[in-house]
Amino acid sequence: MGRGLMNSLKPYLAMISMQFGYAGMYIITMVSLKHGMNHYVLAVYRHAIATAVIAPFALFHERKIRPKMTFRIFLQIALLGFIEPVLDQNLYYVGMTYTSATFASATANVLPAITFVLAIIFRLESVNFKKVRSIAKVVGTVITVSGALLMTLYKGPIVDFIRFGGGGGGGSDGAGGSHGGAGAAAMDKHWIPGTLMLLGRTFGWAGFFILQSFTLKQYPAELSLTTLICLMGTLEGTAVSLVTVRDLSAWKIGFDSNLFAAAYSGVICSGVAYYVQGVVMRERGPVFVATFNPLCVVITAALGVVVLSESIHLGSVIGTLFIIVGLYTVVWGKGKDKRMTDDDEDCKGLPIKSPVKPVDTGKGLAAELEMKSKEGQEAKATTTTQVEI
């Protein structure tokens, strides 16, 4: 029973753990970008490191189960490598520098709704409004998106969860200095373009989930697929960077926060994340994976206050409550879906017993006719005796 409970909890624990990993990435990359790291170069280094780390595991563990590569699968992997590692992440990096780390993670909270709609369009998800579980998925998604929009569109008064003293020690070197004066004015100026980039990034992320789900059905080797996505992302990202980044000094990297940002985001948020979400996706579907993303904004907001000295507004607090309620509503509906699917599979596995008639070999029929003949003769004899009397 204990082992069965742990197996049922694994998908939930895996996705919650990944949100902590993503939250750390939001903060670390924000610091790296503020220290002058080029976002195109960061994306290339990130996936180069992820490829180098994951490739040995893929070569060893999946050497006997790796499917044959076809041209169609190769095109899908190439598209996956462009959508998430190149397009998605660069839109995110630019959008985050124009807004904030908390806002960047908040706009990603519409990911469950977009993924849900795309999953219905591509028949990866079904909705039956006569079923409570389907209504729960729809209502939960709406609540989650409402919370995300509330965090995005309404700030409200600042809520001081943690009060920092003095504020004089921040200096110009660090994250705190960018929030004052000219830095705040520049951020307000680019807020709308940054928001559009972050929303475009979210659509790309949802499309990545859907395409990854289809690709896993044809190429069911999660480690190998992760390695190939990161490799294609590295190659395609390098091609884009060579065109957009003319200053070769931008490629220089030392043992500093920039290298740490590339290594952390590459190993945790690309290598491990692609693999984990692939494993969970094969069992629970892309909507289940996307549903946990709103938890990241709560973690990021807390880290943003402590690490980046960002402010928490009332809209973020109320939006967080909406997100949590919506998240658990969707998870409840998906849990019911999984239970119904398991019950259907169990029923299919049971042997079907039907009443079997004995095979008539001819002897049974003859015996039955003989018995009826004897009964008829006895009845006739009895009638004759009564008449004689």
Curated annotation (Swiss-Prot):
The chain crosses the membrane at residues 13-33, 40-60, 73-93, 102-122, 142-162, 191-211, 225-245, 260-280, 287-307, 312-332. It is found in: Membrane. InterPro entries: EamA_dom, WAT1-related. One of its GO terms (molecular function) is transmembrane transporter activity. The keyword Lipoprotein does not apply. It comes from the Eukaryota. Pfam families: EamA. GO terms for cellular component: membrane. PANTHER family: WAT1-RELATED PROTEIN (PTHR31218). This is WAT1-related protein At1g21890.
